[in-house]
């Protein structure tokens, strides 16, 4: 399989080549583990930054802005037109995900977003 792999880590090619039942189980395991830890880590990092630098404005969240910038810098991107669109989309997705966590007080939405939505972007 060549091309874009949303959950493309070092073992993804081996998992895909392992046959139908094992590839489905392996990809599900990768998505759940990756989604849980990345979503949960952004929620924790955002909370720590907000406890240190609280904002009085409802829609300004320093932790969410920082996490969105970190997410953009940690993941590969390009400076083409579609690369810029992807950067803007990523910023909106991460900022929105963390603002929803702030409004609801529930970090499980961050895990859900990374398990199901983020891997499709």
Ranges and model annotations:
Residues 2-24, 51:
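Membrane-interface interhelical connector segments
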Residues 23-121:
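Transmembrane helix-loop-helix hairpins at the membrane interface
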């Amino acid at each position: 399989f060549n091309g874009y792999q949303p959950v493309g880590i070092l073992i993804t090619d081996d998992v895909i080549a392992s046959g139908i039942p094992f590839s489905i189980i392996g990809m599900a395991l990768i998505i759940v583990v990756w989604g849980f830890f990345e979503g949960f880590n952004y929620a924790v990092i955002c909370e720590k930054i907000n406890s240190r630098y609280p904002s009085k404005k409802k829609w300004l969240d320093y932790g969410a802005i920082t996490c969105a910038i970190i997410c953009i810098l940690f993941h590969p991107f390009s400076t083409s037109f579609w690369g810029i669109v992807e950067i803007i989309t990523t910023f909106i997705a991460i900022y929105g995900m963390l603002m929803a966590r702030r409004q609801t007080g529930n970090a499980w939405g961050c895990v859900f977003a990374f398990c199901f939505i983020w891997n499709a972007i």
